[in-house]
């Protein structure tokens, strides 16, 4: 068996489009390919013994074929196929037909037997009597079968983001496939997302739009979430857990939905043993008492026992230890020498409960400990964490890893993992609005963790999922096959993704646009342009002028020009795209780029208003004020458009967060002088101001030679830093 990439050759039967000035035609001469759809559609055969996940995946695959061709294949459970061509989807343990193919040497099941989430995809000649060809998708387990199936879905043109980002599917009348592939095991065992801070996006969208009958994020929403995770080759979900949302387990069907898709449920660092204490439905202090293990242990244990009784029969990863309510510190004003033994006792009690409910040794149950905020202090003050529990290291909330495993920790049986943020709510400032974490930064920081053994558990905080499509895809691709990336390839990953969706002719435009998008946000995210801190002392709160200067080094002018350039580029591409692609492009590219330009324009023009007013240039000040107000209104217009596209499919998703945590969304104060005609200010760049006096700048990209030896290395890395090119040592 060749260990090659899956290759699919697609042909569209010749057809004429009546009433238009062109025809659509392509060769259909391939006689070697597997006819997934030709004059008829191939049935999809599964085994009734393979369980609900394989059945769900087969039904989704049938839906994918319908999206491409308009034809719906049958999903059957017959053990004696009576057709010339068929698709077989299943696991090698649960599908006797696949077992027999393996025994006959027609597929290499030994390569994936007893492996984690691997698959074989192969066109098999004469697999059984009366069958001429079969497209065989055999998984080592239920998720392996799913990943193999969705690899075929992507090859025929169905994006994992077909629903969540409205990526259109190109129609074909005929699908001829070639396939011969054995997958590797994923780089990271558990890979998934945490839906967080959903108050101003996913929750209002689900409650008032997608799941109105429930009025909450419930099983219908989670079905779409789980499907997306599976299509992105993930396997794990930490559900939404803010108090505005009904806790995951309060809607009985949600856990059944996750299990149907084969998705493992985990929880955040502050939800021990699957219990969401941020929700009053789970923990009500008026009824249940204080969330304090030292004083209210029995009530807390009773809650955990109840949760394990209803959930332990499913695949879960259990958060151990405990923090305070929601994201607060541990309750009780205890010194450190009392905190450490208390948390050790909590963990011991939790493991005893898990062992009793699961009826297997605690060492065999997936568990995590997250040293985050005050629990990091407790850990570093001597907390003894059982060796089989996975340590999950956390970034600093802004993309930089605070800690990775030391040599001793790397020897632990439980290994380590990562909890990483693309979205954050908290001090000193949130960034919930747009996706601005540079892919190279993500790669460099995750590589530090991966190289020190963090390959067990990767969880990504994605906020509301939208508009984090690009960053989420990059993270999941890392987790699936980290070694396929390096510092040279990572910065092109997202541009290539966009080019596959919207057209290769835009590839260089996408690369430039994304480079500038991330570079400009590197020095200041759009959410930080108000120059204030949140939840801080009064002197640090309230909108302020930025520190970008209009007088020195063209700082403000260049920033405005840079954002305007990519905003205009996004608009030009949108105009050039065919109509079916425009909604998806608006969601993933056009809205973020245009909105961040207007956010910068709003604050910088307000700042210019203040400066010109102080200089007595009242006409210029009035012009700057109107520019700031126009930018403010433009953000509202763009957001309204986001919520209106596709007949309001995403209505509520892009609601702006309220001022108590997002002052930057407000209009800064400006001064307007009555009876004074506006006069535009000159915002052109003066090249004489570009450089520091008496300084000489060397562009290291123009090097002629780099000398490295065994002890040290020097390399230039693109896609990171203020200049977007850095020298990396070591």
List each language-model region with its residue ranges.
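The substrate-binding groove and active-site-proximal loops of carbohydrate-active enzymes
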Residues: 47, 134-139, 196-219, 235-245, ...
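C-terminal non-catalytic alpha-helical accessory regions
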Residues: 167-172, 494-662
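Catalytic domains of carbohydrate-active enzymes, especially glycoside hydrolases
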Residues: 214-243, 253, 257-266, 313, ...
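Bacterial Sec-dependent N-terminal signal peptides
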Residues: 1-26
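An acidic-aromatic substrate-binding cleft motif
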Residues: 160-214, 220-240, 414-417
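Extracytoplasmic
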Residues: 669-730
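Contiguous, structured surface segment used for ligand recognition
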Residues: 20-185
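Gly/Pro-rich turn-and-neighbor structural signature
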Residues: 75-77, 168-176, 249-250, 257-260, ...
